[in-house]
């Protein structure tokens, strides 16, 4: 398939994302207009992080976890030497491959079918930079996945997640009244529509609070964890504290 043929195929159907295509056009987007800015905020922060923290990206590798239709995979491919795009659903990987072909980036984007919640071999998936957008809050086992990410991430992680907009502090008794452990974050149990192609597959998910994200990332091995504040004009959920972007570096 040539880039021109792939571009024609991309333009012939609607997408979850408003891709800005190489010929200057945009794909038809299935998201409501009020929600589409979420992707622009995610992309803005990704670009700022790469400019500030990864000046040598052209010599490095990237991993896009839960790549969906490849919107951020092709963005990463414009910065990094190579990109591995991973998703559980085969149709998403096929979309990612088509988009990469349309952008003329197929030689830099490789796809992998896999479930981040199963025991995947960390050695085969190591990457300098890991992108984890819109995935954590769809998972039944987020802590296990964060430990796995810490194993495969060689340098830095950029994570975006829906979060609980509130926290709970205080002690949890541990055996008797005078023994206690401090609360270090919350997880809320939420249902998932397994039939929806943007949801998890188990029917349940644990949605973290902001403190839970911070505590977990530090506990699994990230030496530096930075919450990225929203800019004026960013997607409204970031401004209201219902969604967060986090940059974390290994020691």
Model-derived features: positions:
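Conserved class I S-adenosyl-L-methionine
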Residues: 59-68
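S-adenosyl-L-methionine-dependent methyltransferase catalytic module, highlighting the catalytic core
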Residues: 131-132, 140-250
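Conserved SAM-binding strand-loop segment of SAM-dependent methyltransferases
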Residues: 105-117
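Conserved SAM-binding loop
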Residues: 96-97
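Conserved SAM-binding loop of SAM-dependent methyltransferases across substrates and taxa
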Residues: 69-80
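Conserved alpha-helix/loop element of class I SAM-dependent methyltransferases that forms part
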Residues: 37-59
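Short conserved loop adjoining the S-adenosyl-L-methionine
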Residues: 118-124
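Conserved SAM-binding motif I beta-strand of class I
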Residues: 82-88
């Amino acid at each position: 398939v040539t880039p021109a043929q792939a571009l024609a195929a991309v333009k012939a159907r609607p997408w979850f994302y408003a891709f800005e295509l190489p010929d200057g056009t945009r794909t038809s987007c299935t998201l409501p207009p009020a929600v589409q800015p979420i992707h622009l905020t995610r992309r803005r922060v990704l670009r700022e992080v790469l400019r500030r923290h990864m000046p040598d990206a052209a010599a490095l590798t990237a991993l896009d976890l839960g790549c969906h239709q490849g919107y951020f995979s092709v963005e990463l491919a414009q910065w990094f030497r190579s990109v591995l795009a991973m998703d559980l659903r085969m149709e998403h990987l096929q979309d990612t491959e088509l988009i990469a072909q349309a952008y003329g980036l197929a030689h830099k984007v490789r796809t992998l079918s896999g479930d981040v919640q199963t025991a995947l071999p960390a050695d085969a998936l190591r990457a300098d930079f890991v992108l984890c957008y819109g995935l954590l809050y769809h998972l039944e086992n987020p802590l296990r996945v964060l430990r796995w990410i810490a194993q495969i991430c060689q340098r830095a992680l950029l994570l975006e997640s829906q979060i609980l907009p509130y926290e709970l502090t205080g002690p949890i008794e541990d055996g008797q009244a005078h023994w206690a452990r401090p609360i270090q974050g919350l997880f809320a149990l939420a249902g998932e529509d397994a039939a929806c192609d943007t949801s998890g597959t188990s029917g349940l998910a644990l949605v973290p609070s902001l403190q839970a994200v911070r505590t977990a990332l530090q506990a699994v091995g990230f030496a530096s964890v930075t919450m990225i504040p929203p800019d004026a004009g960013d997607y409204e959920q970031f401004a209201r504290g219902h969604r967060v972007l986090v940059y974390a570096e290994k020691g």
